[in-house]
C-alpha cells in the first residue's frame, strides 16, 4: 500500500471513530511510526509501505480510534518551547495552559532572580517552561503523585533544565518565600466525569476533579500561598471558566487583590492575585 493511500484509510478510520481532527492525527501518527518529518512524509506519499510498518501504523491508528490521546501514542508533546514526554502518569499539557506560562513570564519580567513555585506540576511543563525562559530563576515544583513526579524528573533530564521537585500536597511544607506561585490545579466539578471526552478518561482523575464546584484544591492552595509569597508576590491559577470568578471574589473577600484574566478565546480562565498592599 502506498503511503498516501494509508493516510486516506487511516483518516477515514479516525473519522468513523469520532476523533476531532482525524486527518491531522492520522498524519502525525504515521510520521511518528515511520520516523518521517513533515517534508519527508509529503515527498514519499507515492512510496510503498512494507507490511511490518503498515501493521505498526494500524496498531497506532486503532488505539487512537479507541480515543487513546495522541500524545500518549507519540510519547511526546512540544509545549512552551520545551519538548516533553507524555504518558498516562500525568495530565497531557493543554495548549490553553501556555497562556498561563505567558502570564507568569509577564509577572516576572521585572524580577532579577525570581523564586517560583509550580504547584501540581504534572509533566513538569510549567516549571520547565519557566526555567527555559528565565534560566536564572530558582524554580521548585510539587506534586502529590509520585508517578507524575517521576515523569517530570524525566522531562527535566531530557531538557537539561535544573528544577527542584518535591513530592507532597500543595506547597508540600515549603515556606518560600516565593515571588510567584503558579498552578494549574484540578479544577473540574466531580460531576463532569460522567460527560468527559473519551481522551480525558486516560488522564489521572487526581489531576482533573476537585469536588462539587471544582475548587476543593484551589481553596486550600490559596490559604497556604498567603504566607509563602514575598511582599508584592503573586499567585497565578488556571481554573474552569465556571469557577474562576467565584474564587476571585472569595480572594477579594479574604483581603487579596484579585482579577480574572481571559484565555485567548475570551473565556475567564485565569486568576491573578496578590495580597492587598503588596
Curated annotation (Swiss-Prot):
The keyword Calcium does not apply. Keywords: Methyltransferase, S-adenosyl-L-methionine, Transferase. Substrate binds at residues 184-187. InterPro entries: DNA_methylase_N6_adenine_CS, HemK-like, N5-glutamine_MTase, PrmC_N, RF_methyltr_PrmC, SAM-dependent_MTases_sf, Small_mtfrase_dom. Signal peptide: none annotated. GO terms for molecular function: nucleic acid binding; protein-(glutamine-N5) methyltransferase activity; protein-glutamine N-methyltransferase activity. It comes from the Bacteria. Its EC number is 2.1.1.297. One of its GO terms (biological process) is methylation. Methylates the class 1 translation termination release factors RF1/PrfA and RF2/PrfB on the glutamine residue of the universally conserved GGQ motif. This is Release factor glutamine methyltransferase. The gene is prmC.
